[in-house]
Amino acid sequence: MQTRAIFASAEGRMLMAGLVLAGLLVVGFGIGWTLFPDSILQYAAMTGLNLLIGPGAGMSFGYASGMSHLQVVPLNMLVETLHVLVFYPLFVLSWRHLLDLPALKSFVARMHEAAASRGGMVRKFGIAGLIVFVFVPFWMTGPVVGSIIGFLIGLRPWMNLAIVLLSTYFAISLWALLLNELSAWAATFDRMAPWALLLAIVLI
């Protein structure tokens, strides 16, 4: 592992920012658990669903729990930002052999295969293709794979990061409106219906 080269690279600085942000989030949850133990469980569950399944599940849980846009949207944006700031640099640093950790080899192979198999449109249309790739969630693409494709087609690190995150934030904002409306509509039939909607999203 070449520590100096890692921290001299843009991806190394992104990784540090991601780790600091993740640490602050954990501290925030710890403080919240002390001050507001009941409320913080909802935020922790929403975060966990986002990490394990995706933002659709996390946001659906938030709206089914009665949370507002101001509670749901920023946290899911933060979690997606952490995804990119941690996993994208780990891929790049491992790809360049600046990080040589056996545990990362399978991750790098999987991410490269996913990016290679799904990145045809992005390579053809460049930045516009990357924006669409990240924006459309039903392709099971996501910002992490999108950022890796951006790297593989030669985008500069900070431009790649900006495109991926802005597209992600825009997508989350629009899907938040839709999921909130769906949750409210489902609740008109039965108070448990929003949870059935969440289950459907998880199973899909």
Where do the model's predicted regions map?
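Hydrophobic alpha-helical interface/terminus motif in multipass membrane transporters
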Residues: 61-62, 94, 149, 178, ...
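Transmembrane alpha-helical segments of multi-pass membrane transport proteins and ion-pumping complexes
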Residues: 55, 59, 80-92, 139, ...
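C-terminal transmembrane helix pair
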Residues: 129, 135, 142-144, 149, ...
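Alpha-helical transmembrane spans of integral membrane proteins, capturing the lipid-embedded, hydrophobic core
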Residues: 22-26, 51, 77-81, 164-173
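Membrane-helix boundary/interface segments in integral membrane proteins
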Residues: 120-122, 145-154
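Membrane-interface alpha-helices at helix entry/exit sites of multi-pass transporters
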Residues: 70-77, 152-167
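Membrane-interfacial helix-loop-helix
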Residues: 1-42, 70-136, 180-204
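Transmembrane helix boundary and interhelical junction motifs in multipass membrane proteins
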Residues: 41-67, 137-148
